[in-house]
């Protein structure tokens, strides 16, 4: 999800006392990252579901999760590839903390909110104004005047 690490670096600079971890499957995207002055972040190549499972088994508690512009897998046959349709989705709740999902697909954000509510999380969906984009996708979508959406979920 972290792509080239732009969002990870931005979140680290905005939260200097936090350890920020960015995860992406693509070595190519991670290689394109330009290190910033912030030293409180790391980029990891891997699958989120495997890393979440390891963190849960190690009893790690998180403060905040950002799931930024995930592949929406628009075909019905691919529902289980969506974060909220994957069997590992409950691990996010087990890790604790608030969750923020951003997408240019409103249905994706609405589905995520409904699934998070089934886990017992409080959710709020609203439009997003990308005046200071967190990701390259967010920058591109905002430049193309696409509607952006955010779901914020937190323990009830």
Where are these regions (language model features)?
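Class I SAM-dependent methyltransferase "Motif I" SAM/SAH-binding loop
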Residues: 1-5
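Conserved SAM/SAH-binding beta-strand->alpha-helix loop
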Residues: 26
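S-adenosyl-L-methionine
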Residues: 34-59
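A short SAM/SAH-binding and catalytic strip from SAM-dependent methyltransferases
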Residues: 64-79
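A short glycine-rich, Lys/Arg-flanked "PGG" loop and its adjoining helix->strand segment in the class I
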Residues: 84-98
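Class I S-adenosyl-L-methionine
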Residues: 108-115, 119-156
């Amino acid at each position: 999800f972290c792509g080239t690490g732009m969002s990870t670096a931005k979140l680290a600079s905005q939260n200097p006392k936090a350890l920020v971890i960015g995860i992406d499957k693509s070595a190519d995207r991670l290689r394109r990252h330009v290190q910033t002055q912030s030293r409180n972040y790391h980029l990891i190549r891997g699958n989120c579901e495997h890393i979440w499972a390891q963190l849960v088994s190690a009893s790690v508690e998180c403060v905040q999760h950002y799931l930024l512009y995930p592949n929406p897998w628009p075909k019905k046959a691919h529902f289980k590839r969506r974060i909220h349709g994957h069997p590992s989705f409950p691990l996010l709740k087990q890790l604790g903390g608030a969750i923020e999902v951003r997408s240019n697909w409103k249905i994706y954000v609405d589905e995520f909110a409904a699934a998070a509510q089934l886990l017992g999380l409080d959710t709020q969906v609203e439009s997003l104004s990308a005046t200071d984009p967190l990701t390259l996708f967010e920058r591109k979508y905002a430049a193309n005047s696409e509607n952006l959406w955010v779901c914020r979920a937190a323990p009830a």
